[in-house]
Amino acid sequence: MATIHIESLKEDIAPIVLMPGDPLRAKYIADNFLTDVKLVNKVRNIFAYTGYYNNKRVTVFSSGMGIPSMGIYAYELYKFYDVKKIIRIGTCGTVNKNVKLLDVILATSSYSLSTFPLLFDLDTGKEYFSSVLLNKKIKDVALAMNINIKSGEIITSDVFDPYVDHEKFISNFPDKRFLASEMEAFVLFYLAYKLNREASTL
């Protein structure tokens, strides 16, 4: 069963999806970390691959950049492909002095001024949360691999904030102490909440 934006059959997609923004990063992950890999989507050059990691079937599916693109792919994967868990794996920026280059951040929630929830279902929430259970699994694996993780709230923005005035950007969030800013996690967490699925963001 294909959708408007995804050509895959339902059985092509694993219940667990890793979701980088960049299609070429999805290809890199598939080429270097998965075995028995199959290309399952290339519509609009949004590449997706399904294969095995440590004998666990997983799909790596690129989201593109920004809330609208993530909203399309996360919704279709959750709704029509019966995906249970999506873990966004991507880059972010920060103005937090405690966060250093190459630190790994696990988002416990995302705050945004996006109108996506309002337009989607008249929801007015500005903050949505990642899966506590999925986050615990991620932390447990990181601990076992001796990888330090910083966890906390992030901001999801509709603009690429390095291009705008820093002080003006920060003034939109006067009461927030966030670890990082990025452009996709908010809608992923929102759709997981609406569709009773799980989501995390690294």
What are these language model-derived features?
Residues M1-Y128, V132-L134:
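Metabolite-binding pocket within alpha/beta catalytic cores that recognizes anionic/polar moieties
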Residues S63, F178-M183:
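Active-site nucleophile and cofactor-binding loops and adjacent substrate-binding regions
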Residues V83-K84, L179, E198:
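Short acidic/polar active-site loop segments enriched in Thr and Asp
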Residues P23, G93, I155-F160, V187, ...:
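Glycine-rich beta-alpha junction loops
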Residues E127-D175:
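Active-site rim beta-loop-alpha module in soluble metabolic enzymes
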Residues P68-G71, M183-L188:
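Short glycine/serine/threonine-rich phosphate/pyrophosphate-binding segments
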Residues K56, I147, R197:
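Short glycine/serine/threonine/alanine-rich loop segments
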Residues F186-L202:
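Zn-dependent metallopeptidase/amidohydrolase metal-coordination segment
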